[in-house]
Amino acid sequence: MKNTIIRATAICVTAAMLCSAAGCSRIAGETAGSTEQISDNAAKTGSVIFSRESSFYEQEFVLELSTDTENGIIRYTLDGSDPTDGSPEYAAGITIKDRTGEENLLSNQAAGTLGQGGGFGSGGGMPGNRPGGFQVPRPEGSNLSMEQGNDPKGADTDSNEPKPANTDSEQRGPGNGGGRGPRGGSLSAEPAENVFKGTVVKAAVFSAEGDILSHISVKSYFVSQNIMSRYGSLPVVSVVTDSSNLFDEATGIYANYSQSGSDWERPVYFELFEPDGTLVVSQNMGVRINGGTTRSLAQKALRFYAKDSYDKENPTIEYEIFDGLTKSCNDDILATFKRIILRSSGNDNSGTLFRDALMQELVSDLNVDTQAARPCVAFVNGEFLGIYNIRERYDDHYFANHYDIDGDRVTVLEIASGNSTPEVSEGEESDLEYYEEMWNFFNDHSMADESSYQKALEYVDIDNLMDYHIANIYSANTDWPANNNVFWRYRTENGGYDGGAEWYKDGRYRWIIKDMDWGFGLMSDQTNDTLSHALNESSSGRRGNGFTSSQSTLIFRRLLENQGFQAGFINRFCDVMNTNYNAGTVAEAISNWKSEIEPAIDEQANRYPGSVPGRESWETAVDKMVRFAQERAGYMEGYLQERFSLSNVVDVTLFTDSEAGFIRINDTDITEETKGVSDASSWSGRYFAGTAQRLRAEAKDGHGFVKFVVTDLAEGTTVEYRDPAIEVTLGSAGTKVEAVFE
């Protein structure tokens, strides 16, 4: 599976207008102008030349604009709106300076001001209670009023790309049209103080008659003496857009945050900066509000779409956003994306701000798909928007990219909100028929019968299902399995299992990790018996503080009837706790995430007072995760022991010359490339006495295997084995194993 290295990034997003004129091409840093401004015969051959590129600057400077268009008039805006023939005419240099202390323009909208979504204020307000005449304040250089928002410039009118209604795989927000505040109430998110600001400039060339002669050029500038260190290794996200795309009462996606689907997608211009200010991605894209019930939070998540209808030269994002991310089917670096998400940490938005990202990172090398993550900070129209995690998005494009397959042959199903049956997220409604066939098979057959178990192996990837359950159970994720239960398959030519195909194209179901925000101590602590939660046999969609049901647990319960699967699951659980969930490994990963976002915590708390933690409560939330990591394994050992009537826990110690070779225990290579293994020459793991462990010696080039020397510490007996692959039953006091190479 893929190996993800997490690293911070900067993004800048700018709302752009689509160009429907034939032959319209993108110029770097430019957006297409409003088609209403272009006469039928006008050719957009001109361009605006900026004296400075988008970046971070430590000192203020004078920005100069020029054009090579004869008699061309440059007009510009500084608020994210598109220049028109009524915008200020450029006559002299524009001072780009540190804007510290300037009044907020967009950030000071209190909850409920916009009815459904409350703008940057929160989810307050109910439909039908919208106050009229709301205006977003405009700085010098602005020309667009909110009244113009009923026909927002930049609406996606590209008829070449179909727009099916409501194709979002996420749950809808509360209600069909309106919204409510998070956790049932209105929540103001007006910043405690003025937020840090950059400057965004949009400029275009016009004729004396008012025709637009160029694309709209966009630049973002961040000026501060400490800008290079202000956010540490974090990047910057700047969203520059016509504010009507966000706040218009009828069409704004913030004002109507519970709406979903392509009708609620708005055009943007997207720029991605690395932490040193280097611009690495800049292109036209679309944006929607992302998420389910978290849409009503003050800090909303955003989802970005790369399409040729927005940018013909850049229909995909071509950049290695996630350093070291490889495809799921091979070791190729993944540097092409159709969709990305700026996630505000979901239910953890008032906790650590990285909980789900961390938990997915911890298991990204297991037999499960995960969403790569990279923390960043975001701005909108130059104003600080908050800490976000850049994430991959699960959809047909994700699987097409990760597995080099046709996305149209991908089926993604999801069990959500305590429902007993899944819904189709990607694919066709007829894809449910194969799921029903599989579910009925498990419902009607006991896996204690070996022939039934072998048939079950044609429906599900057993290695994947084990790792998937281990990740959710260990993490104490109770927002599952009757919610956030997502699985996919490749639709084969014969419609079912194809044993002769590559493993990822064989037609079996595979589960993916999604939205684990309730885990690692958010909604329950390290003592939670999530194993019992995952084996619930009641029909209810809820079990205490969580989602589970007999329907959602059926497959796992049935598989555990098979003694071979049960033994493999127990050993695999121990393998993963000894490596991926090694307490020291997890604590280090938590520390890395904490260090990355720490520079922006105070600004985050200022931006969303009362809803996002201040530094002290944030550090407390992070410390709680560390404590979870330190104590969880002990509780899980007890739950496994009780459920499966296991003996005591003992140490298995493996010794070898790591320069000559390594030992594999079950399916885990004890090498220093494996998570949780710091010393491959002398490694110890915890397993249950009386269980059988598979061991295999692997010699490195230039070396050969000689023998295993196995010592039962309770009996004091030593046995030598010449076979490089053996099975050892653990003694009651532990077992010591040495692999000898030559």
Residue ranges and their predicted role:
Residues D79, R343-N347, R558:
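Short strand-loop junctions, especially beta-strand C-caps/beta-turns
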Residues Y57, V195, S262, F354-R355, ...:
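Short, glycine/acidic-rich beta->alpha junctions
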Residues E60-V62, A91, G198-V200, V218, ...:
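Extracellular structured ligand-interaction cores
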Residues G101-G115, G232-V240, S296-Y310, D408, ...:
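Short, surface-exposed secondary-structure junctions/capping segments
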